[in-house]
Amino acid sequence: MNIINLGILAHIDAGKTSVTENLLFASGATEKCGRVDNGDTITDSMDIEKRRGITVRASTTSIIWNGVKCNIIDTPGHMDFIAEVERTFKMLDGAVLILSAKEGIQAQTKLLFSTLQKLQIPTIIFINKIDRAGVNLERLYMDIKTNLSQDVLFMQTVVDGSVYPVCSQTYIKEEYKEFVCNHDDDILERYLADSEISPADYWNTIIALVAKAKVYPVLHGSAMFNIGINELLDAISSFILPPASVSNRLSAYLYKIEHDPKGHKRSFLKIIDGSLRLRDVVRINDSEKFIKIKNLKTIYQGREINVDEVGANDIAIVEDIEDFRIGDYLGAKPCLIQGLSHQHPALKSSVRPNKPEERSKVISALNTLWIEDPSLSFSINSYSDELEISLYGLTQKEIIQTLLEERFSVKVHFDEIKTIYKERPIKKVNKIIQIEVPPNPYWATIGLTLEPLPLGAGLQIESDISYGYLNHSFQNAVFEGIRMSCQSGLHGWEVTDLKVTFTQAEYYSPVSTPADFRQLTPYVFRLALQQSGVDILEPMLCFELQIPQVASSKAITDLQKLMSEIEDISCNNEWCHIKGKVPLNTSKDYASEVSSYTKGLGIFMVKPCGYQITKDGYSDNIRMNEKDKLLFMFQKSMSLK
């Protein structure tokens, strides 16, 4: 039996989970069709998902149709959970991108499709909610060709709420024959030579084009009224093909971790090659760690079943492997989809329990949530001692707050959400602290040179010190100290886009230790950073704004107020497309404003595009290291020189 892994993707509220539930029901995997409104869906299994009607975590289920086993991964539709969606992309053989017939192409729709297109993932577009009043399919078709791709093939026509095929294995319209010829040279040559080409030949060529992500079939339906679901199942089993297995050696990728109500850790793996068997002893990440598979499940027709073996391209579930982390692999390192640029959160908030004595409980709960979702980053501010969480947005914050209260029985308060800035040195500087020169209490001399690098370059560390003079353990201690120092600059933000060179060293044998070098490094780094000064960097968003032409003047005025950099404007009689960059801090709510002043027609699509020097006169009241007496003494001694 062929096995495929299919992602269900959509902008929030396009009907993604409802379509998934209908696929389960129509294929016989469930006895009734779950409804989001009723809170009885299979894929949204978390209480908070059922109650709020949104998908928070990617969930996996399975159906069988036309002899094909299809593992369905239902992904979040909200931008705040984009990291969860990105992890899903790595394991997909194909995708169904769902559009709402009434709302059409929305910001998340375009972002998802551009990623699918970039990664060359075979994709079926499904227009949902065709039953709604006011649907204008012809206008939507134009929008799809304008904003998604010209390479779409509309497989059906819609008449009075029902769908009818216009392209199949036995029948194809003449204009569709031309479409196929324009996309395939072999068919074109046969067509020009007047060779006989059957509908099946065209159909098989379409399948091959879809598999190569060169053509995107478009289908229609309504999950609410079970319209077009069987046709969608047929398309999935026809157009989405399993990958060819390249090896019999085990290779498995861990893409999801969850904990059941009893606290058991459940790990979900995609078997890339080979097979995983009960009682196998397998290596994790090519390390010296081995685990024994003591239990093994897979997903079959919407439910989990115990098995002795899970084969290539299928999903395996194992329990109570404490060493597992998302992104780990078993056996050979898997070849996964490349080209994803991980989006780091650009917002943060301090969180504290309503009862101060429950702080350790909050930390433990957050650690469990981090195991399930590695994009959840939290830390303890070493100066304020506050617990800080990095966030993608307000909805994620609300979900975390609810999970802490309902799942871990601890109530917390979040402070105001703030933008995460970064710091970069302004100029090249060199700083040295000498051994046995007060107030240096460490048996070490360290010299560091700091110099700014281009934006986006990150941290680079080099050493001018010979390992013949100062061995690896001492130099590694300096490198650790540099990385630790970069976590908090003059204003408390991460220091980035700089090169740090270890330029001078002296030690006394046998009294000097790596710890001396590790502990002195932050003081040298700090003094050098103070001498250089820092630029404050703010997160930027690359945006595409599509609006009716009548709203273009307002849009340009708005973008100027948001301190954006407009890079391109193109307009026709009806629409304007504007591209550029805008600070995250000024544009957090602009998508909803666009929807308001364009009556839902406008799209403001953004994606992170690095940092730039802030333009808004950033200032704060943070004074780091005020209680560090040794730093004060270093500063005083340096000022006397």
Curated annotation (Swiss-Prot):
Keyword annotations? Antibiotic resistance, GTP-binding, Nucleotide-binding, Protein biosynthesis
Q: Entry's Gene3D superfamilies?
A: 3.30.230.10, 3.30.70.240, Elongation Factor G (Translational Gtpase), domain 3, P-loop containing nucleotide triphosphate hydrolases, Translation factors
In what residue span(s) does the tr-type G domain sit? 1-244
Checking SUPFAM superfamilies in the record gives: EF-G C-terminal domain-like (SSF54980), P-loop containing nucleoside triphosphate hydrolases (SSF52540), Ribosomal protein S5 domain 2-like (SSF54211), Translation proteins (SSF50447)
Task: Summarize where GTP binds, as residue positions.
Answer: 10-17, 74-78, 128-131
Q: Name one GO biological process term.
A: response to antibiotic
Q: Tell me the GO molecular function terms.
A: GTP binding; GTPase activity
| UniProt xrefs under NCBIfam families | small_GTP, tet_protect, tet_protect_Q
Q: What does this protein do?
A: Abolishes the inhibitory effect of tetracyclin on protein synthesis by a non-covalent modification of the ribosomes.
Annotated family: Belongs to the TRAFAC class translation factor GTPase superfamily. Classic translation factor GTPase family. TetM/TetO subfamily.
Q: What is this protein called?
A: Tetracycline resistance protein TetQ
